[in-house]
Amino acid sequence: MKPLSPLTLSFLLFVFITTLSLAFSNEDVEQVLDVNGKPIFPGGQYYILPAIRGPPGGGVRLGRTGDLTCPVTVLQDRREVKNGLPVKFVIPGISPGIIFTGTPIEIEYTKKPNCAKSSKWLVFVDNVIQKACVGIGGPENYPGIQTLSGLFKIEKHESGFGYKLGFCIKGSPTCLDVGRFDNDEAGRRLNLTEHESFQVVFVEAEANDAEFIKSVV
């Protein structure tokens, strides 16, 4: 492995210190942890589960909704015993590899159906139900449907327990929480909301414990 030059090393150290300084200058910013108190790291595989298990349902997975021909809509499984599909978090650009609350991130599934252009999460506008919903893929998967570019983030939930996801629209100061919407489908859709956010926790997924795409409908 080629050793890093002093200039590169200094730059990376500067980025790391600057990020930490910005993070800890805000008392509300903290490192995101999984249910076992371990830090969440980019590239790791995690299940997104409801903070309160039971009738509220299980983890998040993919499903086919509306007139979409590919299972690209992100749904919360109605079955509380299901963990859903694991995701990984990516910090765009150069980063110290630490995810704090409020850090802009990309979220993507570790597996995707062949018909999906990408495994990355995005937001599409379903005009039938008048909701901005979370999905994966690319514009090709949403013919005639508006898709929104932007980045996600993780914040502490208002209750003080668990976290919530947010989405910030590219080129706009607008950021909205991710909530749930029940449209009497195979699962509850994840959608952008100004009201009740989806209270979640993160569970590290074992490599041999991932559910496969056959679980989608």
Curated annotation (Swiss-Prot):
It is found in: Secreted. PROSITE patterns: SOYBEAN_KUNITZ. It holds the Pfam family Kunitz_legume. Might act as a protease inhibitor involved in plant defense responses. InterPro entries: Kunitz_inhibitor_STI-like_sf (IPR011065), Prot_inh_Kunz-lg (IPR002160). The keyword Phosphoprotein does not apply. This is Kunitz-type trypsin inhibitor-like 2 protein. The keyword Calcium does not apply. GO terms for cellular component: extracellular region. Belongs to the protease inhibitor I3 (leguminous Kunitz-type inhibitor) family. SUPFAM superfamilies: STI-like (SSF50386). SMART domains: STI. It comes from Pisum sativum. It comes from the Eukaryota. Gene3D superfamilies: 2.80.10.50. The lineage of its organism: Eukaryota, Viridiplantae, Streptophyta, Embryophyta, Tracheophyta.
